[in-house]
Amino acid sequence: MNRLIDIIIILCTLTIVSACKDEDEEETIVWGDRTVIVYVSGENSLSSVVATDIEEMKRGSRLIGNNNLVVYVDRSYKSELPWLARIRDGQITDSVSVADIGIDKRDVDSSDPTVMKTVLHYAVRHYPARRDYGLVLWGHSTGWLSSDFSARRTRAYGIDNGHNSLSNTGNWMTIPDLQRVLSTVPHLKFIFADCCNFMCLESLYELRNVADYIIGSPAEIPEAGAFYTDVVPALFESTTFALSILNKYRPAEDICPPLAVVKTSEMENVAHATRNILQTIREDMRDSYPDMTGIIHYYNTNAKNGYLPEYNIFYDAGDFFRHHASEGDYRQWKESLNRAVVGKTMATRWETDKVWSVFYSDFTMTEDNYHGVSMFVPQDPSKGNYANFNQEIRKLAWYHAVNPGNNN
């Protein structure tokens, strides 16, 4: 059914466009078996590494066969409009600026859902796929968080900081907004999130109906992100793409973050299992907040006063249940999670914007306690940023799926 809907969307789009074009004006239409769109939101502190990744993509494109690699690039160059192009056989081809694709702005905000929608629709229209589509989200991410812990501004994916490459104080795109954009394009075979903290149950559940698989890290990733010379060919493997991306993410000699692959069709079952196990934990704990001591956490939001545990967030979902549920309940929940997390690679440490020995020495990563995904656990609102977080989580579908009696 998804394939039929995709074909209808493409044919309708092509019909509308052809009707609006002058008869003597030809559009570039290049079919591929798979089309992968790389959305580079680099108008921020990552601007300096965009060129390196583009060069890696060019090298990797020599091995992609009859497929389309399309890249949209927005970086902090005042003299350069954001542009979209196809990368083929080591070369950038068919390059167009945002003005050419209908975005009439001098300083384009790539975190604006309307901009992303326009870019993706252009890419699908000009580079349609015979088989399926993939999307790479390149940039910053703060998991499911929809507001900053220091100022009220939209967050979650992307960040557009104007022409400033020295900070990350601009606009972000929320995960619900991302979901709404992606629901307007053909169903995706996968989303590869090359950005920090993306593999949280909250975001995965929000995006469960727009892609078959989601690949990324529950933790921070290195500034350079994936090694695209090796990852680009993996993106186009017919059935083994997900595990290949995990295995080729960084060269063997580099520090690689923990990574995971989630099959989104299992997310409803994970939500159901989580609802059941949380209900039991709540009954046991009554009105107290759970002790998170020793549980894997993938970020700490405190940037001023050194390490304070009340600022930890993005706790490993399974490690939390190992600590706070009965062995039988945990085992039953894990069976549901294992059907969703179809691949994962562990790391005992990873690159971070914090001092590892200060912020992450309070837990030990092992194959047993690493589960590949994080989950929000409400904490005392008088501590850290949890007064805000405990309210923000209510904006997401995951919260209402696992807390059926708290729909306010």
Predicted feature locations:
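Acidic/polar, low-complexity intrinsically disordered N-terminal segments immediately downstream
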Residues: 24-68, 72-75
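Sec-dependent signal peptide recognition
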Residues: 2-10
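Phosphate/oxyanion-binding active-site loops and adjacent basic polyanion-contact surfaces
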Residues: 46-50, 108-116, 167-178
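Substrate-binding cleft of extracellular glycoside hydrolase catalytic domains
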Residues: 69-133, 139, 144-145, 151-164
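Terminal, contiguous helix-loop blocks that mediate binding/assembly
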Residues: 29, 121, 125-127, 150-408
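Structural recognition of the beta-strand scaffold that forms the well-ordered cores
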Residues: 35-39, 68-73, 133-137, 189-193, ...
